[in-house]
Swiss-Prot record:
The chain crosses the membrane at residues 649-669. Pfam families: Ebola-like_HR1-HR2 (PF22307), Filo_glycop (PF01611). This is Envelope glycoprotein. One of its GO terms (biological process) is virion attachment to host cell. Residues 38-188 are annotated as: Receptor-binding. N-glycosylated. O-glycosylated in the mucin-like region. One of its GO terms (cellular component) is host cell plasma membrane. Residues 244-259, 281-290, 308-318, 348-414 have a biased composition (Polar residues). The gene is GP.
Amino acid sequence: MKTTCFLISLILIQGTKNLPILEIASNNQPQNVDSVCSGTLQKTEDVHLMGFTLSGQKVADSPLEASKRWAFRTGVPPKNVEYTEGEEAKTCYNISVTDPSGKSLLLDPPTNIRDYPKCKTIHHIQGQNPHAQGIALHLWGAFFLYDRIASTTMYRGKVFTEGNIAAMIVNKTVHKMIFSRQGQGYRHMNLTSTNKYWTSSNGTQTNDTGCFGALQEYNSTKNQTCAPSKIPPPLPTARPEIKLTSTPTDATKLNTTDPSSDDEDLATSGSGSGEREPHTTSDAVTKQGLSSTMPPTPSPQPSTPQQGGNNTNHSQDAVTELDKNNTTAQPSMPPHNTTTISTNNTSKHNFSTLSAPLQNTTNDNTQSTITENEQTSAPSITTLPPTGNPTTAKSTSSKKGPATTAPNTTNEHFTSPPPTPSSTAQHLVYFRRKRSILWREGDMFPFLDGLINAPIDFDPVPNTKTIFDESSSSGASAEEDQHASPNISLTLSYFPNINENTAYSGENENDCDAELRIWSVQEDDLAAGLSWIPFFGPGIEGLYTAVLIKNQNNLVCRLRRLANQTAKSLELLLRVTTEERTFSLINRHAIDFLLTRWGGTCKVLGPDCCIGIEDLSKNISEQIDQIKKDEQKEGTGWGLGGKWWTSDWGVLTNLGILLLLSIAVLIALSCICRIFTKYIG
């Protein structure tokens, strides 16, 4: 009763208290964010979600390295932490991000999303606008599962429901550089797409734009998008920022990584971008009010040599001309629209989304440049120098080497989408890469967005079917479909047929599970501590028991397989030794024949020739047969051996005796009651 009252009061407290997503404080000076990056990392294909349990404890070999991310408490920055096999996702949050006026900053979900992200522990969080300054949630590599679709965008009105997990992973390149600051701005990685997260209208500000998940300053009146500079432009009002409770670290130390060492990791970045993009002399995002479900893309810091081939440096003179043509034409776009932001490298395409096409504000020269770049399978880069720092650079083409960047600039790449016909229908999410990815039975899909451009080392197993094959949007242009790769295909492994012989015979290599689930002391204590929780406790105990039974079956299967393998090995050795004995005897007879004129082999060699090769094949065969009999012997007897009171039959006998005694006691009590009733009454 006390436990029930405690749980009810706890639920009421959680329901009435809104936990802020972060603390907002008015301050004109930006702060460094204390990033905690630690823990062993796992192979992405081995990271699965099984119910409430993370499985997979293998040392990661480059480039697929990941660490888990869950929701974050007030004042605590996102952390990369170590997770072990069997660890549970205990803390997930409903997320509602709003601006100071209370307007939601999240995008509307695509029409094909039917299910919501789910967590075991539910808390409702509301926060103010995190986009102007500071970071609320880290979007690079943060994946929210919507009905088999792993998206990097949280959608408006989609809530967490108890029962599943919202899983998030990043690679080591991202979590080393996510909060880094240095010199003129934040260090960014050279990935393949850059995009704004939300676009909204706020009074006189025609196009308030911010970057979700990026530490940045922006001038809302000038519509800068994710372009931090050394001296942030002033905002009309006090700028909010994160008020941290942890001690800030020297972020410049996080920047001392060798860019070349991260080349392999770029193939599996959290944003799902796997290709290297040609860098430019000075890159900034275009002023076209774009919005996408992809996270903000970092770029390398200034004067950093980049790895890659066939890089093309675009002229900035054309960029300046484009700036003049576009400064007066700012398209208006609802905050929920999304657009394709993809990079058509030589043979790779990015995961992207389509929505209602934008208004075409570029001139004919820009469109022709886009068409030419698409025909040469190179991304069309449209750059714009930051406000107040117009710079020009020399135009070079088809040149390898480090990019020369102007001061106060940040490399952020945008690939302009090809012109699309006018349409008001919102298109569905689709994928630009075809992958056959195995979804093992009992597991949730391991983070589609992070593996979309990553190499898949395993092939689909037989007896599988396609469960998700999203076709490209019907509104996509012909040029875009021409460059698009086949669509992604997920496969789901069937459960074994119950009619098949699935016993742990150990006769084949695949009969037994190669892994044993060893529970740690902490997990034992956790299971014991959670066993009292209603509904969840029995599940924990059932999981624990199921794992123990599975371990026992695996051990039995392994022993049988060991016996079978030992018997087979002995049979092979017996055959080899028998053949060698036969060949030795034949050779000895041949030698005796050749040495007959000299009195035979023993006459020549003396006593050393008296060596007999004993035939022990019969004994070995008997031992092999005994191993097979022991391996096939089942413990189905009544246990009559040993002490009778401890054997199976003895236990049954004891139970029978207790039952008879109980009946006798009941009869005696009944008789006593009657006697008392007769004489006393």
